[in-house]
Structures are given as C-alpha cells and as structure tokens.
Swiss-Prot record:
Cited NCBIfam families: dnlj, PRK07956.1
Superkingdom of source: Bacteria
Function: DNA ligase that catalyzes the formation of phosphodiester linkages between 5'-phosphoryl and 3'-hydroxyl groups in double-stranded DNA using NAD as a coenzyme and as the energy source for the reaction. It is essential for DNA replication and repair of damaged DNA.
Catalytic reactions of this protein: NAD(+) + (deoxyribonucleotide)n-3'-hydroxyl + 5'-phospho-(deoxyribonucleotide)m = (deoxyribonucleotide)n+m + AMP + beta-nicotinamide D-nucleotide
Cofactors: Mg(2+); Mn(2+)
Protein name in UniProt: DNA ligase
Residues that coordinate or bind NAD(+): D45, F46, D47, F48, D49, S94, L95, E120, R143, E177, K289, K313
Any one GO MF annotation of this record: metal ion binding
Cellular component GO terms held in the UniProt record: cytosol
Active site: K122
Alphabetized PROSITE patterns for the sequence: BRCT
Amino acid sequence: MPKKKEDSQKTLSEKEAKGLIAKLSDEIRHHQYLYYVKNDPKISDFDFDQLFRRLQDLEEEFPQFKDLASPTLVVGSDLDKDFEKFQHKLPVLSLINTYNDNELLEWVNKTDPEGLYSVEWKIDGASIVLYYENGILKNGVTRGSGGIGDDVTDNIRTIRNIPLRLPKPITVYLRGEVFMTFKDFEEFNALSSGKYANPRNLSAGSIKQKNSSDTAKRPLRIFTYDATFPNMEKKFKTHQEIFSKLEKLTFPVPPNTAFVSGSKIAKTIQEFKKQKDSLGFPTDGLVIKLNDISKRDALGYTSHSPRWARAYKFDAIMKESKIVDITYAVGRTGKITPRAEIEPISLAGTTVTFATLHNQDYIDELGVGIGAIVRVAKRGEIIPAVEEVVTPGKEVFKIPDRCPSCNTQTIKKESLVDLFCPNPDCPDRVKNGIIFYCQRKQMDIEGLGDKQIEFLYDHDYIKSIADLYDLKDQKEKLMEEEGFGEKSVNIILKGIEQSKQKDFRFLLPSLGLSELGHKVTELLIEHGIDSIDEILSIAKDQKKIESLLEIPGIGPSTIQAFQENFSDKRILKLIERLKKAGLKMKADPIQVADQQPFAGQSWCVTGSFENFQPRDKAMDLIVYYGGRKVSAVSSKTTHLLAGPGAGSKLEKANELGVSVYDEKQFLDLLKSLKIDFKNLI
C-alpha cells in the first residue's frame, strides 16, 4: 500500500527535497520528449503520472524549490525542428488523469455534484488543432508546447474525414485527435512488414511526414471534441450545444458521448467499459467534462490543465510474468517474429501466455532472455508485448539465422530490422497465406479457420490457395478424417464455392501481394484499372507502370511491388488457376452514390441475427449500397435493424419514430431491391 504524502515527504531534508525535485523534473522532461517528439514512450501512462504526481506533491511541500521551468507548469511538447512553427490562438492544455472511481467522484463532488457532465471516449492518437477562417481550413497544428505547435497543414488536409470547406463561412478553432482504426492499422502494418508497434505511434508519425503524399497513403481519421467560435455573437451555454454544432458543420465527433448528472457518472463509466472492446479504434480511457460553460469559466484553468475536466484512464494493462521459452513464428511475407512464452497472466480480461518480442533489435535493446521477469502490456490493445525487463535471464536471446519452418538461410531486407525467410515454398509462409486468404475481411470462407487449414496443408489436401478449389474432388476422403464430418465438410465446400462470387476488389487484396491491399486495389479500380487483364497489360509496359504514379496515394514503393508481383511466375500461375476455377477477375460496377438503394439513409444495427454473423456483416452490406453507419440511435437515424437482444436502442427508436426492421423484414427488403446478399457478405 503506498505511503501517504505526509509520511513520504516530511521526512526529507530541504537538501534532499531540492535534489529529488531536480531529478524528477529531468526525468519527466526526458519522458515527455520520448512521448511527444520521438513517439517512443519507454514507460506507461500510469508510471508517468506517478512521477508527475510525486513532483507535484514535493513542490507543494517545498514551494521554495519550484522553478518557472517545472514540468508541472507546462504541457509536454511535440515540437519538431523540421516544421514551421505556429503560435496557437488559445492555450492548448492537457488533462489531469484519474485512475479510479473514488478519485474521479471526489473531483465531481468538489466541482459540481448535481451538475451535468459529458462522458466521451479518450482517443489514443495524436492531438491536433484545426483552424478554420471563413469556412476554409487554414491550418492544422500539433499541440506542441501548448503555446507553439508544428504546422502540419499539408499532411492534415490528406485525412479524408476532415472537411476542407465548411457549410457556412465561419471562423472556428477545434481540438481533435488523429487516429487509426485497429482494422486499418492491421492492414497497413501487414503491408509494412509489421514494423509499427501500435496505432498511436503510427498516427503520430504519419502527421509528421515530410512529404504529404506519404501521409495520404495512411488510413488516418479524426474525431473532434471541442471548439471555440471567436467571432460568434451568440455564445454557447453548454458543451452539448458545441457538440451539436460540430455535427452540423460535418465534423466527426466521438461516438456515443453521454451527458449525465454527477450522480450517474460511475454507472455511465461501467457502461462505457462494456463497449470498449467492440469500438474498433484505440482508446485509453474517458474524458469527463462539466457541461455548463459559465461554470467552466468560473472554475478556470491551471497553467497545465482545465479545472473543469478530468481524464479517466482505464486500468493500466501491464503485468509481470516470467519467460519460460522463446519461439519464433514465420508469417505469410516470410517475416520471422520472436515471441516469449510466459507464465499465464490475466491481461485486459484475457489469459495471456505469449507476448511478442518484435525483432532481434528489440530483444537486444531490452536485454530479453529465457528466465527473465518481464512486464507485459497490450500494445495498442491488439497484441500483448514484452515492454521491459524487471530481472534479466541467463543471457540475451539470439534468433537463429535459419528459418524455423524450412531451415532456409534468413535475410534482412533493405531498411528493415526484421529477419525474413526468402523461400516462397516455406510451409509456414504458405499456410499463413492461405489463412489470410480465407479470413472474414478477405474472401470470408466459412468453416476454414487456422486449425482446419493447417490440417489440410499438413495432410497434403492443399498446398496453395488455388488447391482450395479442387478440394471438392477429395470430399469423400476428407469426411473420413477425425473432426471433418459430412456437415462440416459441406460447410467448407459451400464457403469455397460461394467465394467464387466475391468481387474482384476482394480477391486481389486477398492474395497477400506486397503493397496490394484493399486501399491500393480501390485506387486502381477508381482509375479504371478494374480487371486482372488490365493489370497484367500494364505490368508489361514500363510507360503504363510509371503512369500509375499519377494516381494520388500510389508511390514508388507500390510501383516497384507492382512490377515484382506481376512478373513473378508463381503469382501468374496462381492467377491463371484461379481464373480457371471461375473466380471473378473483373470488379463489379458500383452505382453512383445517389442512385444506390440505401443512399441518404442512416442505419443502426443492434441485436443478433441468423444470416448476419457477426452483425457487422449487415452493416457492411448497408454501407456497400450507399447507406451511412451510425453507432447510436438519435433523431438523425432513419432506420434500425433490430435482432433479438436489441435492448435500449429499440426502445429509443420507437420513441423517436425511427423505421424499425427485424431480420425477416430486412431480408424481404433486400429481395425487393434485388440484392443477393449471400454473394456479398
């Protein structure tokens, strides 16, 4: 149990206190530099806050040693010498963090116990300030020191959900957070050989690219969460009014923001925690703000933060364990990733027995070895990772120089720290390539999970993606295998057959070719390169290949990969076999947005469904045909698709007069629109 402040500090002499304040100040500045400038934090938010609070307590106890450059008086800085500096028009402050309900409720009771508060997601991304003048985006600026930031306007303009022109010619300054969804991060990181640790680091690095065309290739998004309207005569009375105004101006805001009384904050926090794992974007907590603007003004600010808001950080998901072994996995690209087998720990609600070690450089930097006591965290809430060594093992682990799957000599690719297996026939590479092809977000072949694919490969049923389409010829033999009864085999074969109807825009990125993911595929299709014949024709003509550079979002690395992919005899043979199997080699035409059946409609989906598992499949279908996805029912929602377990969303939809469809009615609607949903989901 931690000591109370008076127990831990009053025993210090003035000389000791002065020295400790100086030491803590230097340590905090160092970690602020690593976090804000290098995007490479070495300690958790929780540990940083403990250092910060310790310094605050000491300065309160020994005010004679607090100087004007104390970290407690200034905001951490992300200033970079490579960008023009911009003087913020208002101070850009940070928030005081709280880590438990009691601490937060103590603040609420002291601030305004009966007042109304907003509870909104704290996005784990890169902080940005947007400056609009007369409705035009003039500047996008990092938080910087809080007074001066880096002008990254050209990079910010590439973010697709940031409006460059507003519906009205007004002047407004906005705070926002640039982020990347988990799905987009995984796809981008896969194309980048997994070199990025988490979405936050990638987002922060992306807005600091020297060339905005590089930023444009990255699937960045933004949520805005506060605004100042300097020239508006009518002042807003509440934060809720500001949020409403932001939405009317087409700014994206954090979903499901709640406005509740102080007495309901604890219950609301628990409700938010239940939603956290299904959000799809990184969050490290909640932000609680007093709703009444006049009360905010009365409370005011410290030099570091507003007195009317707090950040509620979720439990620090980092625990200690012992490394019992270190193994390494070979991915579909050949990248060899070491991972630590650890004594089981519970982390973020799951039992963790493995944690990634990324690469040899990472192992060397931390000094990781078998037998070490380490701290493990969920990095970006995706993959558990070893974060630091508490007690070293016997010796630092070295990855062998031969592939663990096929014994081929490993290589290092230019500018990458990872080791790769160069053998395209490496069993683990092939298996993981087939697993990738069958995943839901790729060709979505039902019944074929990792274990089934590994079995089929190891027992010589399949040795490539194309072999899947010959599996029907071995149906009788397969049904005799343990775990493969007639029912499960029929499901697998049906899934394989249905995949033949998947649009070419899914097929091409599912092949796992370097630099040819969903985003690049869509860019090609948008510019008329919508078939394999067109792609192969371009690949044979150097001038046509170079002309691809004219497409925004396609750069030299994509061009190089394009040439390499479509001159590779193995890939050409695979494409030819898939052609013969009957897969679609030309993209289906997409209707003009305002001609699509769900154009102009806002749909919310809730409950469970027989034909749409998971229910995201129903939403994907609606969006594919022009509808807009919303996560909560409001007066702007036009339709609700409700299955069993719909709960409060159904009640609210009925109250607001929103059109409600159950699954049967929705299927009838699809039928009337002549939408064959089974070939699309």
